[in-house]
Swiss-Prot record:
InterPro entries: Ntn_hydrolases_N, Proteasome_alpha, Proteasome_alpha-type, Proteasome_asu_N, Proteasome_sua/b. GO terms for cellular component: cytoplasm; nucleus; proteasome core complex, alpha-subunit complex. SUPFAM superfamilies: N-terminal nucleophile aminohydrolases (Ntn hydrolases) (SSF56235). It comes from Caenorhabditis elegans. The keyword DNA damage does not apply. It is found in: Cytoplasm; Nucleus. The 26S proteasome consists of a 20S proteasome core and two 19S regulatory subunits. The 20S proteasome core is composed of 28 subunits that are arranged in four stacked rings, resulting in a barrel-shaped structure. The two end rings are each formed by seven alpha subunits, and the two central rings are each formed by seven beta subunits. The catalytic chamber with the active sites is on the inside of the barrel. This is Proteasome subunit alpha type-7. CDD domains: proteasome_alpha_type_7. Gene3D superfamilies: Glutamine Phosphoribosylpyrophosphate, subunit 1, domain 1. Coiled coil: none annotated. GO terms for biological process: proteasome-mediated ubiquitin-dependent protein catabolic process.
Length: 253
């Protein structure tokens, strides 16, 4: 095996590119991120890990705006993400200057994926150790959500997760996602919080959430405050307790 993981451009006999697989392992050690596409909104939530007491938490951001209508979250190496975020922002500006239209979410997702793929095929480089959830709105007001992998693969989803808690969160989303649960901002927010709760300890200090939605043909985006997240967690907990009580009562009958 050691002969085949020394260079990024060498396949193993059974078809593996080990450096790409190692990059995927870096993603699996990253903070959990989840994205959900609602009827008229995109909600992205990420796990916030504890930081040193002397560190300014404003320098720790897992959710980034790359244009007025596109945002992303990532899991993996923060330094790698910073490089790709900067490249994506420049590409958004270049696209708008050239074509006089904002980028589509699919275009910028493909651009990021292509950049990642080039780093899996060039000697003297290494793959980006990050996976990204990219959400936003196209010109016609359609919400879109994409996920990119270290290999350069990218796909569109209605909901997905990445990072260390990807598997349990994705399984929860597969069970709970529906049009009814994403009919508006409030229901979509609850779904994101409940899915993160599968792997993240309760508490507003452990979660960061950003919302992008279309209101009267105008896009609005914001990051929820600690107070808003705390209130949302209380609502979710109240609903959970009520559901458990109802289930217990039905069993007694």
């Amino acid at each position: 095996m050691n002969r085949y993981d020394r260079a990024i451009t060498i396949f193993s006999p059974d078809g593996h590119l080990f450096q790409v697989e190692y990059a995927q392992e870096a993603v699996k050690k990253g903070s959990t991120a989840v994205g959900v596409r609602g009827k008229d909104c995109i909600v992205i939530g990420v796990e916030k890990k504890s930081i040193p007491a002397l560190q300014d938490d404003r320098t720790i951001r897992k959710i980034h705006m790359i244009d007025d209508h596109v945002m992303l979250a990532f899991a993996g190496l923060s330094a790698d993400a910073r490089v790709l975020v900067d490249r994506a922002r420049i590409e958004c500006q270049s696209y708008k200057l050239t074509l006089e239209d904002p980028v589509t979410v699919a275009y910028i997702s493909r651009y990021i994926a292509n950049t990642k793929q080039r780093f899996t095929q060039s000697p003297g480089r290494r793959p980006f150790g990050i996976s990204m959830l990219i959400g936003g709105f196209d010109h016609d007001g359609t919400p879109r959500l994409f996920k990119t992998e270290p290999s350069g693969a990218y796909y569109e989803y209605v909901a997905n997760a990445t990072g260390r808690g990807e598997k349990p969160v994705r399984e929860y989303l597969e069970e709970q996602y529906s049009e009814e649960n994403t009919v508006d901002e409030a229901t979509t927010l609850k779904l994101v919080v409940k899915s993160l709760a599968q792997v993240v300890p309760p508490g507003s200090q452990n979660i960061e959430i950003a919302v992008m939605k279309k209101v009267n043909d105008e896009l609005q985006q914001r990051v929820l405050s600690t107070e808003e997240i705390e209130a949302l967690l209380k609502v979710v907990e109240t609903e959970r307790v009520a559901a458990e009580a109802e289930e217990a009562a039905s069993k007694k009958k």
